[in-house]
Design a protein with these regions (language model features):
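Residues that cap or initiate secondary-structure elements
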Residues: 221, 345, 535-536, 548
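Glycan-processing catalytic domains of CAZymes
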Residues: 1-451, 456-461, 466, 476-498
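C-terminal beta-strand-rich structural cap/linker in extracellular carbohydrate-active enzymes
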Residues: 473, 538-553
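Intrinsic disorder/low-complexity signal
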Residues: 4, 133, 486, 516, ...
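Glycine-centered, small-residue-biased loops immediately flanking beta-strands
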Residues: 470
Length: 553
């Protein structure tokens, strides 16, 4: 792998713009002429509109280094916004969410691309630091989420295609998108910026990173944190990308806090505090919160009142981050356990793989869930990789009957619900796709191989790691005849399984899993140890320790 970059003292910190609290300060009344949330229900602005200067001052007061601005398709000229942000010393990320929801769309897709002229103008200021694609994996799989007139997946049509053919379609489109962004930014005289894949589902991270996008996982939301972060971090390491993290406050829970919409915020202030600390300690390039709506209330005339969640953010920015300078980068991440599997875009429902309505994901793709279940001491479900699977009923749905005109609510419930937590015990699990090389797996003492397909070259690379001392636990359906037998090879083990509850598989796992009450992740010579600080893992405790040396070569 490439040599790690020097560790930053901290990630750059950002805030995403308003979606229900008040108007976009530069678009004004036009903000309410489009839908700014993915709920499918128009929600009028709830607070008086701040002026651009007042809004930029509020961003500065909250400690924002950058602002995530989703472009309103009716107001694509960023000149005034960039001028005001520059005056406040704040960088900008341009996103495509509002266009995805409302159109216009790139031909033959449900995707809005920020126009080249908009990118050039922002780049000319020197303040553009990224271009964000909002939940592109979601909109590839669920192509009719917003656009209902035809089935047109985000990166292109995949009807009737197998996984490799569908990935080729996506790969071609992403290369074109990244190329267009690069050309527009260069045309404005700016330095190259990452094109972000901000994701809710823990699928397609590797597919999109391989094609040129930068992983930007959402924490909190409806995610399982070790699985979400282990997958995105593995993709960033395998494909040498930056890692951005979005602390997304939309979620399943309700409680005694200001509530702008059902499930917004859907995480308690205490959970938010732990999630921010977790994200910081994973040392991303940049970290931002979605959205400003739940950090402040605007009372008019530029008077912003910080909410309980806003006070959590302020404490994080002004106290926790300065007291915890980072001695590592996400590029220093090392796997104690590597999980290798191909991408079938299956998070548990098995439907519409890569947007193909005529197919379902292969049954063998579900072995990935079984692997995570085993690697987490049974704490992650064996049936899916996020909360959007059968068995989870979101408390936020209790608020759906309340007219949106009655929001914001002083509280969503008198007692908090706790469907979502932050903790499952895993031991340094990073995910790599089926194209991983042997030299990218040198730190892993255990390599678990699952999923639906595996190239012969990767099978040979895995055998090389077993020869060098690793235990390779590989699914029988992925092995050719020459590798279909459990045996000792070199100084390691090659263990073939049909099910992870077989005796040989359990033996291989037990030697590497670690304690059932600690989640760990190594970064170079440092080990981050995470423990639940409350029932259900709503809050976390953190410890930084020296990482034990690894004998593998």
């Amino acid at each position: 792998m490439p040599a790690p970059d020097p560790a930053p003292v901290r990630p750059a910190l950002g805030i995403q713009g308003p979606v229900v609290a008040f108007h976009d300060p530069w678009a004004g009344d036009a903000s309410d002429a489009v839908m700014r949330t993915g709920t499918g229900i128009p929600i009028p602005s709830q607070d008086p509109p701040p002026t651009p200067a007042q809004f930029v001052a509020a961003l500065g007061d909250l400690g924002a280094d950058f602002y995530v601005h989703h472009v309103l398709p009716t107001h694509e000229d960023p000149t005034a916004m960039v001028r005001d942000l520059t005056a406040g010393g704040i960088d900008v990320v341009l996103g495509n969410e509002y266009g995805n929801i409302n159109g216009p769309y790139a031909e033959g897709t449900n995707r809005y691309d920020v126009p080249a002229d908009t990118l050039r103008a922002a780049a000319a200021s020197g303040r553009l630091v990224g271009v964000l694609y909002d939940e592109p994996e979601h909109l590839q799989i669920h192509a009719d989420q917003y656009r209902r007139d035809a089935h047109l997946p985000h990166f292109g049509q995949t009807e009737g295609l197998g996984a490799d053919e569908a990935i080729a379609v996506i790969d071609t489109t992403v290369h074109e998108i990244v190329g267009r962004v690069d050309a527009a930014v260069a045309g404005g005289g700016g330095a190259r910026v990452p094109v972000l894949s901000e994701q809710v589902f823990p699928v397609m991270f590797h597919t999109l990173a391989r094609a040129g996008m930068t992983p930007a996982p959402k924490v909190m939301k409806e995610s399982f944190q070790p699985l979400q972060l282990g997958t995105a971090l593995g993709a960033a390491r395998q494909y040498d990308r930056e890692l951005w993290i979005c602390a997304d406050l939309w979620g399943p829970d309700i409680g005694p806090w200001l509530t702008r919409a059902p499930g917004f915020p859907g995480h308690s202030p205490a959970e938010f505090a732990s999630a921010l600390r977790l994200a910081h300690l994973f040392a991303p390039t940049r970290l931002f919160v979605e959205n400003i709506d739940v950090l402040v209330r605007h009372r008019g005339e530029g008077r912003f009142e910080t909410t309980e969640h806003g006070e959590v953010w302020r404490e994080f920015v002004t106290d926790f981050v300065p007291r915890h300078p980072l001695r590592w980068s996400h590029r220093d991440a090392r796997a104690d356990i590597a999980l290798v599997h191909a991408d079938d875009s299956d998070f548990g429902r098995g439907q519409r793989p890569f947007g193909n309505r005529a197919a379902t994901a292969p049954e063998t793709s579900r072995s990935v869930f079984a692997a995570w279940h085993a690697l987490s001491h049974g704490q992650l479900p064996a049936t899916g990789s996020c909360l959007h699977i059968p068995g989870y009923d979101f408390p936020r749905h209790r608020l759906n009957a309340i007219p949106r005109s009655e929001f914001p609510l002083a509280e969503g419930a008198t007692e908090p619900t706790r469907l979502h937590g932050l903790f499952q015990a895993t031991r340094g699990v990073l995910v790599f796709d089926e194209h991983v090389r042997a030299d990218q797996l040198t730190d892993a003492g255990l390599i678990v191989v699952a999923g639906s397909r595996l190239p012969a070259a990767t099978l040979a690379a895995l055998r090389t790691r077993a020869d060098a001392g690793a235990t390779v636990l590989v699914a029988s359906w992925l092995c050719d005849a020459a590798h279909a037998r459990t045996e000792r090879v070199g100084s390691g083990r090659w263990v073939v399984y049909g099910s992870l509850d077989e005796a040989d598989a359990l033996d291989a796992l037990s030697a590497h899993l670690g304690p059932a009450d600690v989640w760990t992740q190594r970064f170079g010579d440092h080990e981050l140890r995470i423990r639940p600080a409350s029932p259900g893992g709503e809050t976390l405790d953190f410890e930084i320790a020296d990482a034990a040396p690894r004998p593998l070569r």
